[in-house]
Curated annotation (Swiss-Prot):
Sequence positions that bind Ca(2+) 2: 56, 58, 60, 62, 67
Pfam families: EF-hand_7
Family of the protein in this entry: Belongs to the parvalbumin family.
Top-level lineage group: Eukaryota
Protein name: Parvalbumin beta 3
UniProt function note: In muscle, parvalbumin is thought to be involved in relaxation after contraction. It binds two calcium ions.
Keywords in alphabetical order: Allergen, Calcium, Metal-binding, Muscle protein, Repeat
SMART domains: EFh
Keyword Nucleotide-binding: no
Length: 74
């Protein structure tokens, strides 16, 4: 896998979590996905919500560090 350890996953999480809230919110996820690849197009609001929902296992509208770990290790 891309991430070698849980520490790598946590480091990635905290890079995406721009406001250091402990959660990845929709705007942070959208910014990360847009910047992930130089040629990436902007995602629609619906696409961003779909990505967010895929990782948001507790339905609070945000991705916590545990949810992020589960998402990237899946």
């Amino acid at each position: 896998t891309f991430f070698k350890s849980n520490d790598d996953v946590k480091k990635a999480f905290f890079v995406i979590d721009q406001d250091k809230s402990g959660f990845i919110e929709e705007d942070e996820l959208k910014l990360f996905l847009q910047n992930f690849s130089a040629g990436a197009r902007a995602l629609t609001a619906g696409e961003t919500k779909t990505f967010l929902a895929a990782g948001d296992s507790d339905g609070d509208g945000m991705i916590g560090v545990d949810e992020f770990q589960a998402l990237v290790k899946a």
